[in-house]
Amino acid sequence: MKRLIVLLFSLFLALSAQAQGLSINELEYFEETGVNVLVYSNQYNGMFCDEKTAGVEIIQRGERIVTGGGVRLMNTPEQWDIYPDLLSRTVDRKAGSITLGFDYPDYSFKPRIEVKAKGTGFTMAVYLDQPVPAFLEGKAGLNLEFFPASYFGKNVLVDGKAKVLPRYPAGETSMHPVSEKVTQFFGLSTFDDRGRGEFIIPAPFAKGNRIVMAPEDDNLRVSIASSEELNIFDGRNLAQNGTFVVRTFLPAGKTGKVVEWDVQPAYDPAWVRKPNIGYSQIGYAPGAKKVAVLELDKNDPVAPEATLFRVAEDGSLQAEKQVPVENWGVFNNRYNYARANFSDVRKPGLYLLEYKGTRTSPFPIADDIYADTWHPTMDVWLPVQMDHMEVNEGYRIWHGRSHMDDALQAPVNYEQQDGYRQGPSTNTKYESYEHIPNLAVGAWYDAGDFDIQSGTVIGLTTQLAALWESQRPERDQTFIDQKTQFVDIHRPDGVPDVIQQCEHGVLNIIAQVENIGFVVQGIVQPTMHQYHHLGDASTITDGLVYDPSLEPYQQVGLRSGTRDDRYAFTGNGATPSGQMSTIAALAAAARVLKPYSPEVADRALKNALKLWEENYEAADPARMMGNAGGFGRGFGGFGGFDGRVQAAVQLWRTTGEQKYRDFFEPIVLAQLQPREMPRGGNFGGFRNQGAARGVEVPMAELGSGAAWGGFMRGGSDLSTALALYNDMDEAFKEAVRKAVPAYAQGLMAQAGNNPYGVPISGRGWGGNEQILGWMINMYNVWKLFPDQIDPQLILDGMNYIYGCHPYSNVSFITAVGVDTKKVAYGNNRADYTFIPGGLVPGLLVMAPDYLECKDDYPFHWGENECCTRNAVQIVVCSLACEEIAHSLK
């Protein structure tokens, strides 16, 4: 009888499992336990094109392993290859199907795709009303892309035959005339064909009718079957950010249903995601609040307790505390959250937390946990970003002297990648393609690429000056020689690194002002194949000034006929209001550099005064309203504020001349007045949050012209008033004191209705930068009015950056903490690694409910690209947290 009961129960389970299947949920994607199929929930980006975050995608066991499903015209689509316009997306929940209509307008090609649930998998079918256009025969195909790093060390079965998936590309390719090539976006080319008029087509490394990716791994296994031939390509033969692409070519001369795939992800009805325990990878100060946030599968009931262990010298674990777990609830639809508070544990030592069998890595409780956390950023990351310098570290050369041929005047009526454009005039004395002398000095690479975005150089120079004056970090661990243009990391030279980096920025600003007349929009790579360059920046150009009288690749002395020099885009930087931030940077730098580099300081101030006199009247916002919106990449509008305020503040602080104070003081005071604006709960546009509320906050919160930049940009605000506070009279101080409570409440309200207590955002770009800016704004209040701000919120922000966040628990600052980001979108990303000390953008908010920051695929810039503009933010926040931690003793 017992055997019969067991048999019947087993049969019931089997029938129940068979009854399960993918279905379309209210958020309009296919869902079943451990499997989600997104069908154009996210679309391609018109500016940065194929970001590998769109199309038909599979999230399997919590990880997005497949992307880019759709009809494409290339075997292995690169970022800048064209994709179709999405004309329609029809969701039929009852039928379990999502139908998509597309258009390739350049080729009058309009395929349709139907994705339909089939058991625990789905089918993808391509329909054509007209045959594939002749030019696209052998080009158009149904694609599905797999992230390579997820499959390193795995295998594939093709019609039952086993094959190792390549860790590094070494496949077959062939050359074809460029007349056969599908044009890329902007009419540009990612391939440097050296004038040969040809391009590369990768060949498949396997083909068959049934493909099983990673059959040995339940987390990664996906099978695809079709009556039409399936090909597997390795896109890394063309581009390091390429993927494994499964592809079926659309047959020529056919209409109707021309291709159908049966796709089966790995499904387990009993699968439950392991808890993600969010905590600080650098540990906690004894007096600080210590709260771990548990990100849990919604099918995983919350346990009442977690266990905090103390790690002994012999490696044994001693239970220190049974930590109560408090359920928080669902956030952004996908997961449930709970919190474990062990703040009462103050004894210094090494600890780890265990919840339902999942353990964290060990972390310290210590007085000095923040003391050296910013050192990798200033010691390594920022020096590696220095343009026009050779950068050495021990036995390694990070890069040689780059862009010594800077720069050519960008041609008129020209637009290129990354949003750069030049209008009908150069606005300078230089003609199109003419060499602009003396620019090969100073500045930093903007981020993972090698452009100079002048807004970054101006902002970072100003921030470095403010950092020196406010927190004065005297650390000296970098040798910087501007005469020989040489940098040596971990080598003191007697001058504080902050001062030398400030000088490096101001040298480039001065060079632009003295040789062009103003700071330009950007100095950037002119071709696509230079733009995506990876490796040593000194090899992007030949370092020789372009001479049009020479043949391409011909070299005579220090000149060459190769037009690879960067372009200076001068269309947008010439606006009078655009020069106000330049004036502020020069004036601030002049003040801090005076004791160390008096000649550079004098040049900086001289140019600041000159620009003020030339642009003061024309920069009046009343005059500029007619030009609103005319700023390109690298310069922002001022949000209705007067950009002259910051320039006047810095000129006053440097020269002491009353006329500057007379100008800025009434404007700053006026901006302290409150106004009504929406605030509150749903900061990041997430699901399962409270509605936003209207509260009265100072107008100051709408924008920021403070030294830090990056978080809120625009005109002056309360940050400016706070920075001026100690230098002003009692009447000014009283006005600020009255404005502070509402301002502080507004800042603290931005913590948001989420379990982490920080303002999470990140649509298109991760929100870590905003969190640091939020922390800095609160710190600026706290150090003057400690009773107005809860300093724990500042520490909470840093805990988030260091690992107490959704998706994973790695530190978002590379090489800082126990478990840190393994990859980042830096210039060494081709090696799936990072430059120490960089801050990645963090969690990308993908529609409709998925947060992601991949740690095995560095090429998502919105998740992993470390930006130069964040370097000082990291230092400021680290020093602020150290100060707060000491105050909590």
Where are these regions (language model features)?
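Bacterial N-terminal signal peptides
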Residues: V6-S16
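Beta-strand-rich N-terminal accessory domains
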Residues: Q20-V71, G171-I201
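Extended, loop-rich substrate-binding clefts of extracytoplasmic carbohydrate-active enzymes
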Residues: R72-V132
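Acidic (Asp/Glu-rich), glycine- and aromatic
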Residues: T123-Y168, R359-I369
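Low-complexity, Pro/Ser/Thr- and charge-rich linker/hinge segments at domain boundaries
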Residues: S150-L157, A270-K289, S361-H399
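Aromatic (Trp/Tyr) and acidic
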Residues: S189-P215, N219, I282, K290-K356, ...
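Beta-strand-rich recognition/accessory modules
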Residues: D193-W271, C881
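Long, well-ordered core segments of solenoidal/helical folds
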Residues: D368-N392, I499-G517, L605-R623, Q658-E701, ...
